[in-house]
């Protein structure tokens, strides 16, 4: 939210909900991994350096973002919401109309990566993606630092 208000104030409200909901499908994929007896293989792949998305795709032929979009489509939620989330794991597939929004979600997802949210490594990855997408990385870095400081103050 700190970063979005600087990147594109008009998108701030529009992206807040997808940013919070984009990992919804992870619960279903975790259950599917368990049902198929693939949990240990999944953990091994991630521990060996595969991203969660790479391991999901390899073992289940889909990713959290794709499943989340399918769930939301089934529930007949907003196409805007669905289209922002659906290609977060492969931004190049996003329609032009949703590309910037999907890129923003990708940067947020990378920085707040479920395995180690706001770790130095994930922050660097997020900054690199932001740079590739043409976003102001200084503003992003400042927003992340502010968020990290706030989280430390809560401990």
Where are the regions that the model predicts?
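Metal-dependent nucleotide-binding catalytic modules
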Residues: 9-10, 14-155
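Hydrophobic, well-ordered beta-alpha structural blocks that scaffold small-molecule cofactor pockets
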Residues: 1-2, 11
